Amino acid sequence: VSGCNEEEYDRVARRLIKEIREESPKRLILLDGLDVGSRPLMTVRDIPHIAQCGRGYQPMLISHYAASWVYGDKPMYFHKEKLSWPLEADGKRYDRDFLLNTLKDAWKPWTDQGGLLFVGEFGAHNQTPHDVTLRWLADLLGVFKELGIGWALWNMSGSFGIMDSGRKDVAYEDFHGHK
């Protein structure tokens, strides 16, 4: 959730959770984190059977490389030859430790109190070089495992997916009509 304050989000979330609970009292409910899933909504820690959803798109330069919609009609620019994982950019080093610390620091207040975290959205755009994507994903999935975080890719099929992604740097096999 982006663009609303915590009080507003809490009020709406509680109302929706109340309605769901009337139909299914023990259902696990996934609640999107604040600021596009980058941090927890701590005010709901008193509600049983919920998990909050984070994102796994850091750094955006890797996950959304050359995605036209990120900065309006101009895709983010970075020399493709310099795109790597680990990555040095803007005077910073992006590596496994960066991924670990970014997730752990943002969600520690929630998980330290027993809150469940599920990264319900992550992946790399088809313009990110395949070898870079694989190294980044290996580190990211390792961090999820280390922190005990459940996960789901943004999509199975499409520009962030593992099938029908339109990548030009992968030799595809046919799988039931998909590549």
Question: What is the predicted role of each segment?
Answer:
Residues E6-R14, R96-L100, D131-L134, A138:
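Non-membrane alpha-helical structural segments and their capping/turn regions in soluble enzymes
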Residues P129-K179:
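Aromatic-rich peripheral "rim/lid" segments of glycoside hydrolase catalytic domains that contact
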Residues F78, F98, F118, F122, ...:
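Phenylalanine-focused residue identity feature
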